Amino acid sequence: MRHTLPIAPQFYVTAPQACPYLDGRRERKLFTALQGDQAETLNNSLSKQGFRRSQNVLYRPSCTDCAACLSARIRVADFAPRRGHKRISRRNEHLFRNPRSAWATEEQYALFRTYLDTRHADGGMADMDVFEFAAMIEETPVKTRVIEYRDRTDGDDLAAVCLTDILDDGLSLVYSFFAPELQKNSLGTYVILDHIALAQEAGLPYVYLGYWVPGSTKMGYKASFPALEVHVNGDWQDIGDPADYDTQTHPLSTDPIAQQVAQITLPDLRGENGRSDGLRGFSDGP
């Protein structure tokens, strides 16, 4: 019989570093560990509040003078593909979906390296070796799949890969990459379109895309999807006109970290034997 009390999640803050999306900005993240029997429950709850998973950590931006990064998701039931989306789907009809367990392969890593070297050679992941890649894929305490996309007309060659979490209300695209020589096929957009179809098949209402950043050319394509919602001031709302979003934020408009943590709604992590006191932990990270 368990007599110890479950420990409430502890939240930490990363040290500021250069923003990968907007020049001249500094990013900072609020994060907590994702572990134990209740990891899936916590992941489901915090994903609805704008958090993202990276291995066994959940995080969301908590920058001191910027709030440009907005968590984005698509309402599957309301999604109607635009003409350009239909063209992209037809352009990739030769691909087939191949879901796998979260287990890294040498073939996936080879494609990952080619993708980084071609498109993100100066990015934060550029130096990842095969062991770090395996950790990114395999270190998951929640329900995760690797969705491969293979070319049936070319010996089933690997064309794209998406690391996908299965939430209680949707699919979350954790990270995706594709063959750079197929860039003209808009594979990044195609992977999202296929995940919308996959969510429809599974009866899941949302597809989580990660962060949309107004003013960032890297993230602009996400705003092209109909039925897109963004997480703003604690609530999900229809994106409306992307041009209405301002990347400039007054420094005093950002809540202190302790207040941000206090506003997080934690799930009931009590098991059959034990109770949670509901307290939130907070510590400054290194």
From Swiss-Prot:
GO molecular function, one term: leucyl-tRNA--protein transferase activity
Catalytic activity, as annotated: N-terminal L-glutamyl-[protein] + L-leucyl-tRNA(Leu) = N-terminal L-leucyl-L-glutamyl-[protein] + tRNA(Leu) + H(+); N-terminal L-aspartyl-[protein] + L-leucyl-tRNA(Leu) = N-terminal L-leucyl-L-aspartyl-[protein] + tRNA(Leu) + H(+)
SUPFAM superfamilies according to UniProt: Acyl-CoA N-acyltransferases (Nat)
Subcellular localization: Cytoplasm
EC number: 2.3.2.29
Cellular component, GO annotation: cytoplasm
Predominant location category: cytoplasm
Keyword annotations of the record: Acyltransferase, Cytoplasm, Transferase
Protein name, as recorded: Aspartate/glutamate leucyltransferase
Organism field: Jannaschia sp. (strain CCS1)
Gene that encodes it: bpt
